[in-house]
Amino acid sequence: MARYFRRRKFCRFTAEGVVEIDYKDIATLKNYITESGKIVPSRITGTRAKYQRQLARAIKRARYLSLLPYTDRHQ
């Protein structure tokens, strides 16, 4: 039987040495929301708790300023 190889999750922000996650960096924030607009949990992305809190805050600010949508386009 073949064993399933699970890739080790790592925090991208720790590896890059990011101090603060900026709400204006839409390209980065889009990687951490689903197609329906939900914030992806850290157990899936591998983000550390400190950066997950900053990420959630940045996404919520970007939504408030209409830089990111709250939900997907309902058609």
Swiss-Prot record:
It comes from the Bacteria. GO terms for biological process: translation. GO terms for cellular component: cytosolic small ribosomal subunit. Keywords: Ribonucleoprotein, Ribosomal protein, RNA-binding, rRNA-binding. PANTHER family: 30S RIBOSOMAL PROTEIN S18, SMALL RIBOSOMAL SUBUNIT PROTEIN BS18M. Binds as a heterodimer with protein bS6 to the central domain of the 16S rRNA, where it helps stabilize the platform of the 30S subunit. Belongs to the bacterial ribosomal protein bS18 family. This is Small ribosomal subunit protein bS18.
